[in-house]
């Protein structure tokens, strides 16, 4: 029997509805409008699309959106000055600098300049450290989305064997911490891991975030496992057009797994929705309010 297709698009839409309801409550009860500032440097086409989507969804949720577009040759000192101004702005509760940055700009220095309380990408070392310590923290959006998707299949992840393929600071490492906080038993794998297919076959939960098209084959997957595919890879398609695939061989996985996220229509849909969640959480924390329901 084919696996269940995890509909990230529908789950993200429901999450955005919940965020909009929470924003309306904050406006009504506390005169608080969560505000998100997005900084886009340069004219990378993919980044422009991402920022446009973030701005549109922020406004649709009833939040304040502040978009700052800078030229690719903007000096780093000017970028840091903008971030310092946003850190002080009481109308801004979340700050996101769209990555990757143009050459000549140091992403580490720029990200670390963001006030950790407004770091809705969850990349500041303070938030990474709090997450690793099991303390409340703003969490990177994609790993947060992965956990939400997995919990639509399993009410609890406690005691489950999970494997995370990929150890990036953006996805793999924070995802491991989130899984540990859920009391899952976690293996983290990477390019140097030995016997990777055998390790995958032991996992109840497989999270693929390696950036290698269709690397995870059907015979890597334990029957009935849940597979969350974070990869977004573009391959040549018919008629000179390209096609998007994940890090998992989707058709093969559907014949073995219990549930699988598609690409597109899976994890990617959750990332912006979780950015909205983080912005609302940041706004409540900054204003000294109890944690929101989303």
UniProtKB/Swiss-Prot annotation:
What pathway is this protein said to act in by its record? Answer: One-carbon metabolism; tetrahydrofolate interconversion
Q: Which InterPro entries does this UniProt record tie to the protein?
A: Aminoacid_DH-like_N_sf, NAD(P)-bd_dom_sf, THF_DH/CycHdrlase, THF_DH/CycHdrlase_cat_dom, THF_DH/CycHdrlase_CS, THF_DH/CycHdrlase_NAD-bd_dom
Residues that bind NADP(+)? 166-168, 191, 232
- Which CDD domains does the entry mention? NAD_bind_m-THF_DH_Cyclohyd
Q: Give coiled-coil spans as residue ranges.
A: none
| Biological processes annotated in GO | L-histidine biosynthetic process; methionine biosynthetic process; purine nucleotide biosynthetic process; tetrahydrofolate interconversion
Mind telling me which GO cellular component terms the entry cites? cytosol
Identify a single GO molecular function assigned to this protein.
Answer: methenyltetrahydrofolate cyclohydrolase activity
Tell me, what's a Pfam family for it? THF_DHG_CYH_C
Q: Which UniProt keywords apply?
A: Amino-acid biosynthesis, Histidine biosynthesis, Hydrolase, Methionine biosynthesis, Multifunctional enzyme, NADP, One-carbon metabolism, Oxidoreductase, Purine biosynthesis
Its catalytic activity? (6R)-5,10-methylene-5,6,7,8-tetrahydrofolate + NADP(+) = (6R)-5,10-methenyltetrahydrofolate + NADPH; (6R)-5,10-methenyltetrahydrofolate + H2O = (6R)-10-formyltetrahydrofolate + H(+)
EC number in record: 1.5.1.5, 3.5.4.9
The family database entries (PANTHER family) matched by this protein are listed as: C-1-TETRAHYDROFOLATE SYNTHASE, CYTOPLASMIC, C-1-TETRAHYDROFOLATE SYNTHASE, CYTOPLASMIC-RELATED
Q: Which family does it belong to?
A: Belongs to the tetrahydrofolate dehydrogenase/cyclohydrolase family.
Free-text function comment from the UniProt entry: Catalyzes the oxidation of 5,10-methylenetetrahydrofolate to 5,10-methenyltetrahydrofolate and then the hydrolysis of 5,10-methenyltetrahydrofolate to 10-formyltetrahydrofolate.
Self-association state and partner proteins as the record states: Homodimer.
What name goes with this protein? Answer: Bifunctional protein FolD
Organism for this UniProt entry: Afipia carboxidovorans (strain ATCC 49405 / DSM 1227 / KCTC 32145 / OM5) (Oligotropha carboxidovorans)
């Amino acid at each position: 029997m084919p696996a269940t297709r995890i509909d990230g698009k529908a789950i993200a839409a429901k999450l955005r509805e919940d965020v909009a309801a929470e924003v309306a409550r904050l406006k009504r009860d506390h005169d608080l409008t969560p505000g998100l500032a997005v900084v886009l440097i340069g004219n990378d086409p993919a980044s422009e699309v991402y920022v446009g989507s973030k701005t549109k969804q922020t406004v649709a949720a009833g939040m304040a959106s502040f978009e700052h577009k800078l030229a690719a040759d903007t000096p780093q000192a000017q970028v840091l000055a903008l971030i310092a101004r946003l850190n002080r702005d009481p109308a801004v509760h979340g700050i996101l600098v769209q990555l990757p940055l143009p050459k000549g700009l140091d992403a580490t220095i720029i990200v670390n300049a963001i006030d950790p309380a407004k770091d809705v990408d969850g990349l500041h070392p303070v938030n990474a450290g709090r997450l690793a310590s099991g303390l409340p923290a703003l969490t990177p959006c994609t790993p947060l989305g992965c956990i939400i998707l997995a919990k639509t299949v399993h009410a609890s992840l406690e005691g489950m064997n999970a494997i995370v393929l990929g150890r990036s600071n953006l996805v793999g490492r924070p995802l491991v911490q989130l899984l540990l906080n859920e009391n899952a038993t976690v293996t983290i794998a990477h390019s140097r891991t030995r016997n990777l297919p055998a390790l995958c076959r032991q996992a109840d939960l497989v999270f693929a975030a390696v950036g290698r098209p269709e690397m995870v084959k059907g015979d890597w997957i334990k029957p009935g496992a849940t597979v969350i595919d974070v990869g977004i890879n573009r391959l040549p398609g018919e008629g000179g057009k390209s096609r998007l695939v994940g890090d998992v061989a989707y058709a093969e996985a559907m014949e073995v797994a219990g549930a699988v996220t598609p690409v597109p229509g899976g994890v990617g849909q959750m990332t912006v929705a979780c950015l909205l969640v983080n912005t609302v959480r940041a706004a409540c924390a900054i204003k000294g309010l109890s944690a929101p329901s989303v």
